[in-house]
């Protein structure tokens, strides 16, 4: 056996070799996960392509687009979804939306759940069907990364849920999803649902965060992981050649956008900032309606008590505020249990809040028209 000769440089060389092998292995694992080819779309959809100019969202012809609709949840917690196809159909044809916000889970996208054996193919195909249904109705769809895993896939012991920040696996998710739907005119990319409990520096640039797992079991430790910032996710989308409109929710569960005015904005174009002003949130001007604001703002979630009129005053005030500031919106949620629900049952009978939202949608469609 040949004798190994070590020098002072040997530890450094070995360290570099091991590091490079580790990086190569990580890159190979990511590459093996990427499953999507860019989908083709009907050229007749081209006029729907969105871009921003100042505070406005415009279509390909430079006409201002007014966006209003609903969230349709369940694909974050269910691989097969719960009535999602029928809900999309009802939202488009009965509720007259021109925008649907669709929450997703990165682990389900890649088939990382224990009940998935196809690498996520069926899940991705279902999302394709929903995107196509929206396209056929000339309706926009906001693909929202709602649930993440703190950087560890579920089938490797991770914790899937609504965490404080995205993680390294979120980069892989956006590489694949943005490749699949890049430049499809009716698709919007929503980077991460509701960041919270971090600084605006971490929100934009990433950093180490401590996160208590959802559904925490007795004695279960907190999770410490490296969060990925919104700038990295935005850059990931653009790196695959996607020019689609990108939405970025602020802090305090996507409510607070004030840090953008303090120098923590995302560098990029075709960007819309997102806020979730639920009934318990106050001081709208400070958090997302500052007169000096230079970017489009989107109310991605809002809602009030489904079965009483207790929140009706709040809802009326918010819709007046949205009209005054010309803010697009999607109400939460067209599901019977994802609160506050807009429907009582799967016959799509509206709740009190659902009836209010349905009336607001009808008024918006009458004022601005649908995209049909």
Regions found by a protein language model. Give the residues of each.
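Aromatic- and acidic-residue-enriched carbohydrate-binding clefts of CAZyme catalytic domains
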Residues: 113-123, 154-164, 208-215
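Bacterial N-terminal signal peptides that target proteins for export
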Residues: 1-12
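Aromatic-lined substrate-binding rim segments of carbohydrate-active enzymes
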Residues: 83-152, 167-170, 226, 231-240, ...
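Extracellular glycoside hydrolase catalytic/binding regions
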Residues: 49, 74, 81, 161, ...
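Bacterial N-terminal signal peptides
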Residues: 11-21
């Amino acid at each position: 056996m040949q004798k190994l000769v070590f020098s002072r440089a040997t530890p450094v060389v070995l360290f570099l070799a091991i590091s490079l092998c580790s990086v190569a292995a990580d890159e190979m694992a990511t590459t093996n996960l990427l499953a999507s080819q860019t989908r083709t779309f009907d050229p007749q959809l081209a006029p729907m392509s969105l871009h921003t100019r100042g505070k406005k969202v415009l279509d390909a012809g430079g006409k201002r687009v007014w966006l209003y609709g609903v969230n349709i949840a369940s694909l974050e917690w269910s691989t097969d979804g719960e009535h999602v196809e029928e809900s999309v159909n009802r939202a488009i044809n009965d509720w007259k939306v021109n925008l649907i916000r669709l929450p997703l889970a990165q682990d389900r996208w890649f088939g990382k759940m224990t009940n998935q054996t196809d690498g996520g193919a069926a899940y991705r195909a279902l999302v394709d069907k929903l995107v196509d249904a929206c396209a056929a109705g000339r309706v926009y769809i906001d693909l929202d990364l709602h649930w993440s895993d703190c950087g560890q896939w579920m089938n490797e012991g991770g914790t899937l849920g609504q965490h404080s920040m995205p993680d390294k696996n979120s980069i892989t998710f956006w590489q694949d999803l943005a490749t699949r739907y890049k430049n499809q005119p009716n698709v919007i990319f929503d980077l991460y649902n509701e960041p919270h409990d971090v600084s605006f520096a971490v929100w934009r640039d990433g950093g180490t965060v401590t996160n208590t797992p959802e559904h925490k079991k007795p004695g279960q430790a907190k999770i410490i992981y490296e969060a990925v910032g919104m700038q990295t996710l935005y850059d990931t989308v653009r790196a695959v050649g996607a020019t689609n409109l990108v939405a970025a929710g602020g802090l305090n569960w996507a409510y607070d956008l004030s840090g953008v005015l303090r120098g923590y904005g995302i560098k990029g174009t075709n960007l819309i900032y997102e806020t979730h002003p639920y009934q318990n949130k106050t001081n709208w001007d400070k958090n997302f309606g500052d007169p000096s604001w230079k970017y489009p703002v989107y109310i991605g979630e809002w809602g009030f008590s489904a079965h009483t009129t207790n929140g009706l005053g709040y809802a009326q005030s918010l819709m007046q505020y949205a009209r005054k500031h010309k803010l697009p919106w999607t109400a939460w949620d067209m599901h019977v249990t994802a609160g506050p629900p807009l429907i009582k049952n799967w016959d799509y009978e509206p709740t009190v809040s659902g009836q209010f939202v349905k009336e607001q949608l009808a008024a918006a469609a009458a004022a601005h028209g649908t995209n049909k």
